UniProtKB/Swiss-Prot annotation:
It is a peripheral membrane protein. Pfam families: ABC_tran. Signal peptide: none annotated. ATP binds at residues 42-49. The gene is lolD. The keyword RNA-binding does not apply. Its EC number is 7.6.2.-. This is Lipoprotein-releasing system ATP-binding protein LolD.
Amino acid sequence: MSKIIIACRDLYKSYFQGNLEVPVLHGIDLQVNEGEMVAIVGASGSGKSTLLHVLGGLDKPTRGEVTLLDRELSTISEAERGSLRNHALGFVYQFHHLLPEFSAQENVAMPLFIRRMNKKAAMEQAAAMLQRVGLGHRLTHTPGELSGGERQRAAVARALVTRPACVLADEPTGNLDRHTAEAVFDLMLELNHEANAGLVIVTHDTQLASRADRVLHLVDGMLQ
């Protein structure tokens, strides 16, 4: 039986504008097993990114619970949540969020530096991961010297360099042309399969989503 990596139960999320409550998520139930890819499809403004942020411990639910590697996030301290997030999760976004003043290799090594890995080992591991995503010849290049597809490949490498239990991807190909998007998506699937990690991807691209193990639709804050 596959291990449950990340799950939420009876999840609600609202934002408040003064006294006005703006509900975003309504009673979400979800679990993702190791090695499983789940695609969540929804229109802009449907709450996809909010759901991903709550699952990743970047935002707190209004009600309900989120469990990551059998630990309920609301029951642990902020420091413990940060440590668990850094060790168990990888994040990929539509915009690469690479640090412009650092090389591709240094950017990919950042999560390892946060883990206090020594610099030599971290840089070697980052170089190996960049080689794996086809950027072994671009180690010393800054993000400004990379193409859009190369920057997103570097972002994927950064998300996976720590060998996370689950990757949360928010429109990871939304800023790319179709050919490059498919190449980056193929790479994510291949690397995630090799690592037997969970993968949750939110997207409006139904063609790419159809390749997931499960496709869920977020409509009016509810999963269908």
